[in-house]
Every structure is written in C-alpha cells, then in structure tokens.
Swiss-Prot record:
UniProt gene name: pyrH
Binding site for ATP: 16-19, 59, 63, 166-167, 172, 175
Protein name: Uridylate kinase
NCBIfam families documented for this protein: pyrH_bact (TIGR02075)
This protein's record includes keyword Nucleotide-binding: yes
Regulation: Inhibited by UTP.
Recorded GO CC terms: cytosol
Length: 242
C-alpha cells in the first residue's frame, strides 16, 4: 500500500458505478454482499490517500429510456430514474458507513430530509475533508444519462480521472459476451469511441470529456481490489483519452 499520496498519479478520482453493478446476479434490486465488496474496494482506495467521489446509476431499479419506449412521457420517466439513483446512493452510503467510511450524499434534485442538495463548493469541501461524496439524481435534468452526470461532476470536482466500473474489463470493438474474438483496447481515443459507436458511454458524455481533457478508465468491478489496482496503472482496463 502506498503511504505517500505524492507517489500516486491520480489523487482525486470519480468512480461511476452502474445500477446493474449493485444487483450482482439478481435481476432487480440490490445484492448486499456485492455492495459491501464494492464499498471495501472504495475503502482500499481511500486508505491510499485518494479523494473519491461517486456517481451511481439507477438501472437496477428503473430505466427511464426503456419506460419511454412503451409510451411513458420521456421526461417523467427520466425523473423516476433519478429517484432510483437516490435509492442506490442511500443504500451505498449506508453500507459504506458500516465500514466506517465517512460519506455524504448530494442530490441534483433537492431532498432535504434525506440528503444535502448538490452545491459544488460544498461537495469540494467534503472531499477535501476526505469524505466520500456520492452524487445522486443524475444531472437533475431529463434526457441526460448518469454517464453524462459522471463526466460533469468529475470536471466540476477537478478530478484527475473518471473510473467507470463495469461488468467487463475494458472497451472492446464488439460485445465480448457475444463475440469470443472481440478485440480489447488498452487505450483508445475519444474520437474513435464516437466514430465506432462503441457502447461504453453515450456520445454526449464522451464529447464533454474530450472537450475538457478528462481521461476515462473502464474496468471490471467484479474482481475484488480492481479499483485500487487500476488507479495505480495495474490490472486490466482501457483508457480513453485524446
């Protein structure tokens, strides 16, 4: 374990955790053993001296875009999806605090009874005090994904890198679950991700990351300890940069 924070390349990071990552092998909801493992991985990174922020998705509970396809108003469906991210954020906070990780949930949609509203300066101050900040509610606007929220929050918090935790160990030229010959990229440019329509993040999120020179690293959250390894340039991952 690195004791000198100055030895680390990335000292402030944002972790994007999908809702699907929280449900493990279930079809819906939460798998608490999986969430506890993720919380343990986060604690390992905190112990390195790294400042950590998190954006959590809501796809394990509700997907606004899917609901809109069957007739629900898209904006209303997206707001319901934002509420799903709040459920996940509070669940993750509870598990993390059981491991003695100081955590604050800040929501883009004010819910004063359960968490703080998102205020950029307050969020940065929490991170300076070594608290983990979980951003809920996406961007607070419909028609925006939680990937876009992750990129925006990473930029606002002046993070060195965005880590996207997924079910696969990087970015491939096709779905490795369907194509055994899929090629994995070690590094790939923002432009190539967009041009090749690679399904790692939505185009808007990649475009904003590119404009602000925010590197993105995609890795698998399924293997314990991967988060700490990846921010130290170890393990399996793909880096998206210029």
């Amino acid at each position: 374990m690195i004791s000198d924070i100055n030895a680390l390349k990335y000292k402030k990071v944002l972790l994007k955790v999908s809702g699907e990552a929280l449900m493990g092998d279930k079809q819906f909801g939460h798998e608490y053993d999986v969430i506890k493992k993720i919380a343990g991985d986060i604690k390992e990174v905190i112990n390195l001296g790294v400042e950590v922020a998190i954006v959590v998705g809501g796809g394990n509970i509700y997907r606004g875009i899917n609901a809109s396809l069957v007739g629900m108003d898209r904006a209303s469906a997206d707001y319901i999806g934002m509420l799903a991210t709040m459920i996940n954020a509070l669940t993750l906070q509870n598990v993390m605090e059981s491991l003695n990780i100081y955590t604050r949930v800040l929501s883009a949609i004010p819910m004063m009874s359960v968490c703080e509203p998102y205020i950029r300066r307050k969020a940065k101050r929490h991170m300076e005090k070594k608290r983990v900040v979980i951003f809920a509610g996406g961007t607070g606007n419909p028609f925006c994904t939680t990937d876009s929220a992750a990129v925006l929050r990473a930029i606002e918090m002046n993070c060195d890198i965005l880590l996207k935790a997924t079910q696969v160990d990087g970015v491939y030229d096709s779905d490795p679950k369907k194509n055994p010959d899929a090629k994995k990229y070690f590094t790939i440019s923002y432009k190539d991700v967009i041009t090749n329509s690679l399904q790692v993040m939505d185009t808007a999120a990649i475009a904003v990351a590119r404009e602000n020179k925010l590197p993105i690293r995609v890795f698998s959250i399924k293997e314990q300890g991967n988060f700490a390894r990846v921010i130290q340039d170890k393990g399996e991952y793909t880096t998206i940069e210029e």
